[in-house]
Amino acid sequence: YSPEMVDGLTVGYGQGDVETTTGTKLDDTAMYLKYTYGSVTVGYQENERSAAATSNAIDFEAFGISYAVSDNITVAYNQSESKNGADADVQEASGISASFTSGGMTIAGVMNDVDNVAFDSANDTEGYELNIAFAF
């Protein structure tokens, strides 16, 4: 939904439930805000999963910002945090990306870091990617 009174603002909300097994119900709720002003876009999202078993309950929160330096170059930063109701370890992720486009060619790179993957304090990971794409 994009309210007319605030140009560049988009908001969204959704909810639903799933019965995974007989008598086991998961309630999911998600909401987001995105605001674009000129060449800057900022986004925020929250998700919540409620369940009778705390091991199935998850809270998720994310924030991101991107900046179009020019028509050809964009840089962005994102971070998120997930909490599991049955676990003290919080999964934290962050990433930086940049892209350059010229004609039909795009060169893009990302660096991501995730701590406590799957809520396991001994499971941290990093990832890097460089992508070159051509459109014909």
Which residues does each PLM region occupy?
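Outer-membrane beta-barrel proteins
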Residues: 1-136
